[in-house]
Amino acid sequence: MNAITMPDIIGYNRRRFLRNMANTVAAAGFATVAFADDESDMNTTTMATAKPGSHTSFRSLKQIDAGVLNIGYVEDGPADGPVVILLHGWPYDIYSYVDVAPVLAAAGYRVIVPYVRGYGTTTFLSSEAMRNGQPSAVALDTIALMDALKIPKAVIAGFDWGARTGCIIAALWPERCKALVSVSGYLIGGQAAGRKPLPPQAELQWWYQFYFATERGRAGYDKYRHDFAKLIWKIASPKWNFDDATFERSAASLDNPDHVAIAIHNYRWRLDLAEGEPKYDDWEKRLAEAPVINVPTITMEGDANGAPHPDAAAYAKKFSGRYAHRLITGGIGHNLPQEAPQSFADAVKEVDSYS
């Protein structure tokens, strides 16, 4: 009898997960057209508004090989429209943009919403690849996706990990970023910054990062990943009364077999408790210098964001191009695009007009 190797296990888990995701996708209605198909509707901006929770599905789910990954993504809007890429964070997924995408598509944008590595149907092409959560590695996934889709330049918008990726692309590859929308502002950092202790109240907000630094934390997150994610959602958005169906649509993406490894590596790497890959060293050195972002930018913040986030006044000077900051009121928390989709879509359209 042949010995079972780690690649065998990874391959089995990957196949099983993809089968389960396919069933989830079908149940969620990806194959159902949730947006207006009429061309006149697609070109009408005055009729398109985004009410939180008004959509529960996307037009379609696609897959494409890009860099080290096979990336799952949804796409809507005219194929020849200006491109906007919407990037989700942890522990969320593409459904953060389920109400944003139709508004932008109706305004004429080609909207791309990818699953980040370790989420949904995005998987590694090689079972031997390091499950790396370094910020530069995650950002380069988006560059690889743009290359695979032959997108030379796009408006990039995101929150949480997605905002960090947007900031990194705008700073290191400004020729690929037409404009930026970043929830919680300038999120570029490095391991040196992660080694510096913060005041106790600030450290308390990062409790999960310290939990993940332990093997107990890794095991606990793996065992209770849905419960853990729901807790984070509630802490980060204390006034958002999301229902179980809304949560479970996104939580299914966390069952990706690479999810725990990538999330744990990301937070350990930030504290300099895990090594990265040498091929990213030069990029991380540049990011550690906190480069200024020159592309047109709108930063956003919800008035009830319960997640750790910097003060807007502290990072405004990091944006040297045309810049605006928007505080969104009404009890809006960390998952701003899902909680205030119209405000987020408006910011994308506004920042696009800056360039």
Show the residue positions of the predicted features.
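Catalytic histidine-centered segment of alpha/beta-hydrolase-like enzymes
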Residues: 332-340
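Conserved HGGG/HGGXW glycine-rich cap/lid loop of the alpha/beta-hydrolase fold
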Residues: 76-123
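Flexible "cap/lid" subdomain of the alpha/beta-hydrolase fold that forms the substrate-access gate
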Residues: 41, 46-58, 68-71, 76, ...
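C-terminal alpha-helix
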Residues: 347-355
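Hydrophobic "lid"/C-terminal helical patch
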Residues: 21, 142, 344, 348
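N-terminal secretory signal peptides
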Residues: 1-16, 23-25, 37-38
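Short acidic-hydrophobic surface loop/beta-edge motif
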Residues: 62-66
